[in-house]
């Protein structure tokens, strides 16, 4: 083999190695586009992973069930929107042996039925006799945990005639936004953290039967291969956690006010270097 050919083969090998390394430096993260907290959390994490850890990040917007299926099969490397132990309890039970739980990125999360403070109803039980709601609950995407629990609540509270209207996170808040200034009664499926609590005066309907469960955590879940494939990312996800609903709310409100999620994340990361340092410290 002459020198020129040897150099050519060597160059090809270096290119192949570089390509392999580049491929190994990419991670995919699934999120639910209609969930304000999912969008905010995922984009901030992606910005840190890209800028501080040097990985390319591929974000994939999917439904909740597909999100869990993706991380369980390894088609997704991580998800940061796992509501546990109740909301995504069924998904966890089905997939817990196929994934790695890196712990909560948000504590004191809560789901349930939400109404404006101006309505008389204070409990889910009140919906049975309050005709002002016109036997309708405005929901989000079908198959999400809060929708499954709301279907159960309709049965458990004997809300005969009530219909759960599937929509999206944006569709739900749009209907709420139309009803609120008219002081109309409206019940929606909702959760904390969410920007709508900063925009309107709202309240959770009491849930004496405990259908929606108590406070939850939103966890970061990784595929079985993530720690081997991207150890720095796995280490980051173990430390990544919002301190309060106001902290994540800063990002959610920026997005709601018109900022693109990527830009809102960049702005937040640039504004809070001390928090990023806590998450990425070795």
Predicted regions span which residues?
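A conserved helix-loop-strand patch within extracytoplasmic ligand-binding domains
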Residues: 96-143
């Amino acid at each position: 083999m002459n020198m020129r050919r040897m150099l050519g083969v060597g160059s090809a090998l270096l290119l192949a190695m570089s390509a392999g390394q580049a491929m190994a430096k990419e991670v995919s993260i699934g999120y639910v586009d209609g969930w304000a907290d999912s969008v905010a959390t995922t984009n901030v994490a992606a910005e840190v992973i890209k800028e501080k850890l040097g990985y390319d990040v591929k974000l994939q917007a999917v439904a909740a069930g597909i999100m869990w299926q993706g991380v369980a099969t390894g088609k997704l490397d991580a998800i940061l929107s796992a509501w546990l132990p109740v909301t995504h309890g069924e998904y966890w039970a089905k997939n817990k042996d196929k994934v790695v739980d890196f712990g909560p990125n948000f504590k004191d999360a809560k789901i349930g039925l939400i109404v404006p403070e101006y309505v008389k109803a204070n409990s889910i039980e009140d919906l049975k006799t309050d005709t002002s709601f016109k036997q309708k609950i405005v929901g989000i995407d079908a198959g999400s945990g809060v929708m499954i629990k709301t279907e159960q609540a309709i049965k458990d509270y004997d809300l005969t005639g009530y219909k759960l209207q599937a929509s999206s996170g944006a569709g739900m808040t749009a209907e709420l936004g139309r009803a609120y200034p008219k002081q109309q009664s409206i019940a929606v499926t909702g959760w904390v953290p969410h920007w709508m609590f900063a925009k309107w005066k709202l309240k959770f309907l009491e849930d004496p039967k405990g259908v929606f469960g108590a406070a939850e955590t939103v966890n970061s879940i990784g595929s079985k291969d993530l720690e081997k494939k991207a150890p720095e990312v796995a280490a980051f996800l173990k430390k990544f956690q919002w301190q309060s609903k106001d902290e994540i709310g800063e990002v959610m409100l920026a997005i709601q006010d018109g900022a693109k999620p990527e830009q809102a994340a960049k702005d937040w990361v640039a504004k809070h270097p001390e928090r990023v340092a806590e998450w990425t410290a070795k």
